[in-house]
From Swiss-Prot:
pH-activity profile: Optimum pH is 7.8.
GO terms of biological process kind: cell wall organization; pectin catabolic process
Name of this protein: Pectate lyase H
An annotated GO cellular component: extracellular region
EC numbers on record: 4.2.2.2
Keyword Lipid biosynthesis applies: no
Compartments in which it is found: Secreted
Temperature sensitivity of activity: Optimum temperature is 22 degrees Celsius.
Family label: Belongs to the polysaccharide lyase 3 family.
Native species: Emericella nidulans (strain FGSC A4 / ATCC 38163 / CBS 112.46 / NRRL 194 / M139) (Aspergillus nidulans)
Taxonomic classification: Eukaryota, Fungi, Dikarya, Ascomycota, Pezizomycotina
Catalytic activity entry: Eliminative cleavage of (1->4)-alpha-D-galacturonan to give oligosaccharides with 4-deoxy-alpha-D-galact-4-enuronosyl groups at their non-reducing ends
Length: 260
């Protein structure tokens, strides 16, 4: 059973996390450089959910409280829908929320969704998984830090727009699924993003017609690769092959991006 929108939440006066979750948060923030401070807002309180909270085509305004599940991060061991903090159904909006470190799967979207001013204090497996549907998927403001691998995982089709988002200490900001059983043409539009200390800003599957468009207002400091192209596969037992990086017909941007 999932908690439905409108049911009673379990409120807590302080962040209720296990020792492992605290350790994960400390590890994620321990690398903060003197020249960059992750601008996560102050929390207005904390909420620990016993079950995933579903937003069924409506708007949920979290009032800048910190929401978690009271569990330890399991690293890159992939969880399921029941491990998410929020599931946003088609047409739903999640806004003004901090996702705590005491969780595994962050936020899932099932269909078109808007994620507005949502912050992840420490990413576990993924921050945001766009599971199904053809979009549009809109990520407006907010930010994430401490992602060993992906921040935004795009499994459905359509277009993802990421604007005014801050990402720090990360593997990839955006990845079009490289080995999903059902593959689609996917597109990502990145505008005004601040990216610091990462491996890849974007990874796309050019063999499926994916594109990434990155505007000149996006800045990147100590990001090793801005846009990588992969040969994706529909075999989940195979790993996609990276075939190129840099500006192209599929990776649409002007090099170099400005420093943050």
């Amino acid at each position: 059973m999932f908690i439905k929108n409108g049911l009673l939440l379990s409120l807590a006066t302080s962040v209720l996390a296990t020792h492992g979750a605290r350790s994960h948060s400390q590890a994620a923030t321990s690398k903060l450089s003197k020249r960059f401070t992750f601008p996560i807002p102050n929390s207005e309180g904390s909420v620990t959910l016993d079950e995933v909270y579903e937003i069924d085509g409506e708007t949920f305004d979290g009032g800048m409280k910190t929401y978690g599940r009271g569990v330890s991060c399991t690293g890159q061991d992939e969880g399921g829908d029941s491990d998410a903090v929020f599931i946003v159904k088609n047409g739903g909006t999640l806004k003004n929320v901090i996702i705590g470190s005491d969780q595994i799967e962050g936020v899932h979207c099932e269909g078109s969704c808007t994620i507005e001013n949502v912050w992840w204090e420490a990413v576990c497996e993924d921050a945001l998984s766009l599971k199904t549907g053809d979009g549009p998927f809109n990520v407006v403001g907010g930010g994430a830090q401490g992602a060993d691998d992906k921040v935004i995982q795009h499994n459905g089709g359509g277009t993802v727009s990421i604007s005014d988002f801050t990402v720090y200490d990360f593997g990839k900001l955006y990845r079009s699924c490289g080995n999903c059983g059902d593959q689609y043409e996917r597109h990502v539009v990145i505008e005004g993003v601040t990216a610091v200390d990462g491996k890849y800003l974007v990874g796309i599957n050019s063999n499926y017609g994916d594109t990434a468009t990155i505007d000149s207002a996006t800045c990147a400091t100590d990001v090793k690769t801005i846009c990588a192209e992969y040969k994706g596969t529909d075999n989940n037992d195979e790993e996609p092959e990276e075939v190129s990086d840099g500006p192209s017909d599929y990776c649409i941007y002007t090099e170099p991006l400005s420093e943050c």
